A protein has these predicted regions:
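C-terminal accessory/tail domains of diverse enzymes
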Residues: 1-77, 106, 173-389, 394-398
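An acidic- and aromatic-residue-enriched active-site/binding cleft used to recognize and process polar
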Residues: 16, 79, 84-89, 122, ...
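Metal-dependent DNA replication initiation modules
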Residues: 84, 88, 101, 106-122, ...
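Well-ordered mid-protein domain cores that form the structural environment of catalytic cofactors
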Residues: 54-120
Length: 398
């Protein structure tokens, strides 16, 4: 049985000259004039929605073509689009919220949390037979989501400083009241009742604000992965899509066979596991879901690959996913590449590298870092030329 997949990607909008985040998403979308793109809470980001695909190859081609269209439209405006959890050169303001009634209400309700929503993620949708299956599968896949976050970690910088984290986006995201691990529910009715209670509490206003790491889609018969940073390289999105499809296929198979759930419903450790993944990405240790103990990231991820091999083979994905995982572990995380660019050049070089990878370029370590700006007025672009301030531990954002 074919289990179809799709992806949503969010992109930062940056000024090519300064490398800074700019609130020009509306202008970019107006210039595109195409379906499949949308606005986000902040005017500094746009979203794309893929078509539904049977194969990872089809998903890769779709995402790559979408990125090329976005890049071309942005270039005509002196802009670039960047797929990453954060961009290094940004300023927090309350004036960049998208002109939309719902978004304005969110900005009023959540204030600084909404103002600092200068982050982007990638979301993966996997087909499920029905909503009950989606809800029951959530419990089984949840322990394996932090390793997927580690693979996508691409946000070490925040407001011009190195946070010490591989995914600072995760730290920002977890401040929303419903962000974090999903609970375990016996049926869609149980889940829907619990979510209705959250809405009735007044803390959130609608189902669109259910920001758990994984959730059943409100509009499609899919299970949606939401824990990941946006990924500079399309290959990373495809790798995660392949692994998540296998997780869902494996969970559905176990439910159909009446196998004992692989999750006891106690998810307290999962928040700690997500923190560990956000802190060090694939360069450090992760919490191994099989043992709930720390282990080197490559060990955890290769163990995950072995565990999911039958499900990967059922989708025809095993060889591709194994190759992509080997390449990801050899290349290191996006966070590692970005820190190297900052160390060798500056934060503008980081933005240049992100934009190049987003459009599909795979450059030698310093090839994206050679751009020099013409002389400008005193003080202009100072932040763009400044070298990064390093921090081995997180500071207070903003």
């Amino acid at each position: 049985v074919t289990v179809r997949i799709g992806a949503e990607e969010e992109f930062h909008v940056v000024d090519v000259e300064s490398g800074r985040l700019v609130p020009r998403a509306g202008t970019l979308l107006d210039g595109l004039g195409e379906p499949g793109f949308g606005r986000e809470l902040q005017q500094t980001a746009v979203e794309s929605n893929s078509r539904v695909h049977d194969t990872l190859e089809g998903l890769f081609a779709d995402l790559s073509a979408t990125r090329r269209r976005l890049d071309a439209a942005a270039a005509r405006l002196g802009l670039a689009v960047v797929a990453a959890g954060t961009v290094p050169l940004a300023s927090v303001t309350s004036r960049a919220v998208t002109a939309d009634t719902r978004f304005r209400r969110m900005a009023d309700d959540y204030r600084r949390v909404a103002d600092e929503q200068l982050i982007c993620s990638a979301q993966i949708h996997v087909d499920v037979p029905d909503r009950d299956s989606a809800v029951r599968a959530m419990c089984l896949v949840s322990p394996w989501l932090p390793p997927l976050l580690a693979l996508t970690a691409s946000s070490p910088f925040w407001l011009g400083a190195d946070t010490g984290y591989a995914s600072w986006r995760t730290m920002l995201w977890q401040r929303w009241p419903t962000a974090g691990p999903a609970g375990c529910y016996g049926s869609a009715a149980d889940y829907d009742a619990a979510m209705a209670e959250l809405i009735d509490s007044g803390v959130i206003s609608d189902t669109g604000m259910l920001y758990h790491d994984v959730r059943p889609s409100a509009h499609q018969c899919t299970l949606e992965l939401r824990i990941c940073d946006a990924c500079p390289r399309t290959e990373t999105v495809v790798l995660v899509a392949g692994l998540f499809r296998a997780l869902v296929r494996d969970a559905l198979g176990r439910l159909e066979r009446g196998a004992e759930p692989g999750c006891d419903g106690h998810h307290e450790w999962l928040r700690a596991a997500a923190w560990r993944a956000a802190r060090s990405g694939i360069e450090g240790r992760l919490v191994d879901p099989a043992t709930r103990r720390g282990a080197p990231a490559p060990v955890v991820l290769r163990g995950m690959l072995r565990r999911l091999r039958p499900a990967l083979e059922a989708s025809g994905d095993f060889t591709a996913v194994r190759t992509l995982l080997d390449e990801a572990l050899a290349a290191g995380s996006a966070a590692r590449r970005l820190r190297r660019a900052a160390r060798e050049e500056n934060l503008l070089a980081v933005t240049d590298l992100l934009a190049a990878e987003t459009r599909g370029e795979r450059l030698a370590p310093r090839a994206a870092h050679r751009r020099r700006r013409p002389a400008r007025a005193p003080g202009a672009g100072r932040a763009a030329r400044a070298h990064v301030h390093s921090a081995s531990a997180p500071g207070t954002p903003g």
